[in-house]
């Protein structure tokens, strides 16, 4: 069970869209998208090498267009997908990048340092390796093919390999992927655009200014972004700048924010009014209030993301992965420094760059890895990062003009993706073999950290009781008073530790309650807030949290500030505990560990006392 995020009227800040979502539903969606991408890749390869290969080529070169008066505009199917539809892909990437740097994982510099530096090395080292094979000439211009990792395939590969305790390495790789995307976008904008036409460029700048002002419109901001986005695409196309960057530009200018208390409560009031007196006026007001309580960035990701994952990217694979793999093509590719440069850049360059940078950051003390994340696991993830598909094939099409050399580069990308998967699989399997996994969940994964954990009792107490629970769980020991009896029995001989494990499927308000407790903890009021939350388990709505914070002795303005502005710090404190619980395959609350060993059996005070007494002996 992993923490998920809900867009609800409870109003606490949302989790990052790509980094911190760990729900089974989200993972299933990611895996399905990766499977669909792989399916269409295979279809394209089979089609291009079948007796019907001519129909594949004919489809790609089919012209689609429109005209009015003396003006006509048309594109081939391939360019329609690569230059028009892929704009939506880069739009989603831009939204995610904006979010992560504004309110997401990359706002926490200490956590982001290692994956950010590793990502930068994972961009630079592959390019250097590629240029070692292709130091000059037209081939050298294709260095951008090897700099990017395909996030969809990366997530899917990790799901197929199933390494031991994947949560930490998955989060690390997704953080890395955001920076990887930024580097790829910069490379496309700077190095892979045609000669610039000044007139259309001036128009594009004017459209960008208009886009920056859209956020101040009182209504119809969505349609305004759409219309101006199309205008920007046309202006960039005419200016000689790759038009897909219009998607990035629009995304970067769309505001993103964490939901604030007043808009959320206003939405709740509107819904309550509609419930009491259903009519069209109240319905419109409630709908508008709900929309405005969530940033346009969030709404756009929700609206456009599925279409990108399940329609646009599979179409992109279909029109770009159809490489002729006959004997002559393969022999030409085997002798081509372009092919070998792509393979070496992605497979070796990514691995050396990411692993080496991570080792260097740890060695110099400039960064730290999350608990349970080892360099061996980073190495496995670094190997999988050599799966460079979507943006790699995209850059092949714009960096190389000769069709024969394009096929050589595409063969390199496909071969590198297969080799990177096998390489990553081998590293994870060897790692698990060298460090044989113990029975999952039998022992406490992360030792007690008095400076970090929420504890009661002496740090050097001979007995330790760790509880993973949530504030909505009616059976959690703290709620039933069992822990108080146990502490009273052992006195200073017992150290009690609370860790978060919000079971949202059963307890939908538990995650918000956990975050509220961490906001109170920043004022030294964790246990007071926990007491209030347990005492009011049936009333854990958003508005209730502030009332409980006051009762716990919190400064309410500081509490509100900590929840909203410092949301990443509060968030990580909860998700760290939840990821530990997932890694131990915990599935119920409360789950207790007696002196580091999982307690099995009743959790009433008498049973816990007997278990602890046995541990003393």
From Swiss-Prot:
Q: Where is this region: Na(+)/H(+) antiporter NhaA?
A: 1-433
Q: Which GO terms describe its cellular component?
A: plasma membrane
Q: Which reaction(s) does its UniProt entry say it catalyses?
A: Na(+)(in) + 2 H(+)(out) = Na(+)(out) + 2 H(+)(in)
Among InterPro entries, the record links this protein to: Na/H_antiporter_dom_sf, NhaA, Thioredoxin-like_fold, Thioredoxin-like_sf, Thioredoxin_domain
Key words of the record: Antiport, Cell membrane, Ion transport, Membrane, Sodium, Sodium transport, Transmembrane, Transmembrane helix, Transport
Instruction: Kindly give the CDD domains that the UniProt entry links to this protein.
Output: DsbA_family
An example GO BP is:
regulation of pH
Q: What is the membrane topology here?
A: Multi-pass membrane protein
Q: Where is the Thioredoxin domain?
A: 434-617
> GO molecular-function annotation terms?
oxidoreductase activity; sodium:proton antiporter activity
The molecule here is called Na(+)/H(+) antiporter NhaA 1
Organism source for this protein? Answer: Mycolicibacterium vanbaalenii (strain DSM 7251 / JCM 13017 / BCRC 16820 / KCTC 9966 / NRRL B-24157 / PYR-1) (Mycobacterium vanbaalenii)
């Amino acid at each position: 069970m992993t923490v998920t995020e809900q867009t609800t009227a409870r109003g606490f800040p949302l989790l990052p869209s790509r980094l911190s979502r760990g729900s089974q539903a989200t993972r299933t969606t990611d895996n399905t998208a990766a499977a669909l991408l792989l399916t269409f890749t295979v279809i394209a390869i089979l089609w291009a090498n079948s007796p019907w290969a001519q129909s594949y080529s004919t489809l790609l070169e089919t012209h689609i267009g429109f005209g009015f008066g003396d003006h006509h505009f048309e594109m081939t199917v391939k360019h329609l997908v690569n230059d028009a539809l892929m704009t939506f892909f880069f739009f989603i990437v831009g939204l995610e990048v904006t979010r992560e740097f504004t309110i997401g994982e990359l706002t926490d510099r200490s956590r982001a340092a290692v994956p950010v530096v590793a990502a930068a090395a994972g961009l630079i080292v592959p390019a250097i390796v590629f240029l070692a094979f292709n130091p000059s000439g037209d081939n050298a211009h294709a260095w951008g093919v090897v700099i990017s990792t395909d996030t969809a395939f990366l997530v899917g590969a990790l799901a197929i390999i199933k390494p031991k305790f994947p949560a930490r390495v998955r989060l690390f790789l997704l953080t890395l992927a955001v920076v990887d995307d930024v580097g790829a976008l910069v490379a496309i904008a700077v190095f892979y655009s045609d000669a610039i036409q000044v007139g259309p460029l001036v128009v594009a700048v004017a459209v960008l200014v208009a886009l920056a002002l859209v956020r101040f419109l009182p209504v119809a901001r969505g349609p305004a972004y759409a219309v101006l986005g199309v205008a920007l695409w046309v202006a960039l196309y005419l200016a000689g700048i790759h038009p897909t960057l219009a998607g990035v530009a629009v995304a970067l200018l769309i505001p993103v924010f964490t939901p604030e208390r007043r808009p959320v409560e206003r939405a709740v009031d509107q819904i309550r009014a509609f419930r009491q007196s259903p009519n069209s006026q109240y319905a419109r007001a409630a709908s508008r209030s709900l929309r405005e309580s969530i940033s346009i960035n969030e709404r756009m990701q929700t609206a456009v993301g599925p279409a990108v994952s399940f329609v646009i990217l599979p179409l992109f694979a279909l029109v770009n992965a159809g490489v002729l793999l006959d004997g002559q093509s393969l022999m030409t590719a085997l002798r081509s420094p372009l092919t070998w440069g792509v393979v070496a850049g992605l497979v070796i360059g990514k691995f050396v760059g990411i692993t080496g940078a991570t080792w260097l950051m740890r060695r110099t003390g400039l960064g730290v890895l999350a608990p349970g994340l080892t360099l061996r696991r980073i190495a496995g993830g670094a190997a999988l990062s050599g799966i460079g598909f979507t943006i790699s094939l995209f850059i092949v099409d714009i960096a190389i003009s000769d069709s024969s050399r394009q096929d050589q580069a595409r063969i390199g990308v496909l071969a590198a993706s297969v080799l990177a998967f096998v390489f990553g699989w081998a590293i994870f399997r060897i790692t698990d073999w060298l460090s044989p996994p113990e029975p999952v969940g039998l022992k406490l994964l992360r030792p007690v950290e008095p400076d970090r954990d929420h504890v009661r009792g002496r740090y050097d107490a001979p007995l330790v009781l760790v509880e993973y629970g949530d504030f909505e769980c009616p059976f959690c020991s703290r709620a039933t008073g069992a822990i108080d009896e146990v502490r009273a029995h052992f006195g200073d001989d017992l150290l009690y530790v609370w860790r978060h494990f919000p079971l949202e499927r059963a307890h939908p308000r538990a995650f918000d309650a956990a975050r509220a407790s961490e906001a109170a903890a920043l004022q030294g009021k964790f246990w007071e807030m926990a007491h209030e939350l347990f005492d009011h388990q049936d009333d854990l709505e958003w508005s209730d949290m502030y009332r409980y914070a006051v009762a716990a002795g919190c400064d309410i303005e500081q509490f509100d500030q900590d929840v909203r502005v410092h949301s990443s710090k509060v968030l990580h404190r909860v998700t760290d505990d939840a990821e530990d619980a997932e890694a131990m395959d915990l599935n119920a609350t409360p789950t207790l560990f007696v002196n580091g060993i999982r307690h099995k059996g009743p959790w009433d005070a008498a049973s816990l006392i007997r278990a602890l007494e046995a541990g003393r002996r």
